[in-house]
Swiss-Prot record:
It catalyses: H(+)(in) = H(+)(out). The gene is MT-ATP6. The chain crosses the membrane at residues 14-34, 69-89, 98-118, 139-159, 174-194, 196-216. Belongs to the ATPase A chain family. It comes from Struthio camelus (Common ostrich). This is ATP synthase F(0) complex subunit a. Coiled coil: none annotated.
Amino acid sequence: MNLSFFDQFASPQLLGIPLILLSLLFPTLLLPSPNNRWINNRLSTLQLWFLQLITKQLMMPLNKAGHKWALILTSLMTFLLLINLLGLLPYTFTPTTQLSMNMALAFPLWLATLLTGLRNQPSISLGHLLPEGTPTPLIPALILIETTSLLIRPLALGVRLTANLTAGHLLIQLISTATLALLPTMPTISVLTATVLLLLTILELAVAMIQAYVFVLLLSLYLQENI
């Protein structure tokens, strides 16, 4: 049976049971469990430093009222980061290449930030739909444009994460396939292609980390507008 390049993005199944939930739970096994020791080991210390760094970066734009979101945003950042990095391992499934999953993360959190603004400061939240100093004839058009841009925010969040990871995985598979195909006939070109593959893999490691950070950072900026 001929396999398609997009088969790697299909959700794996065992006896008809989707295994995507298992892949979502696996990153939690990599996190060190807390203990009662006075001195933590190197892994726990590194994890604590990383979480503090993420929390500081995400909470800096927010006021004190937004600090209650620190736990969920930091947890989401760690979750996406681990899933993206684990998806770069050979023969693994990356759940964040599924638009349905990314939308399931983006839409509820975006809606929560929007409802927070409408509850706490409705006039300011609705005021974002009409920029200050807008000429009167342009008011209806600008309200429609701003409303549309507001409603497509969760779609943009989900599509951005899906597209970046999907494109990277496809490039890696295409170049690795070309490397194996050229090895028997043109070994020199195959070595050069393997070098490109190594550089692309390093780039994808950076993309996996950056996209997880951008996803959560944009959510924190949406929250900043509504608190």
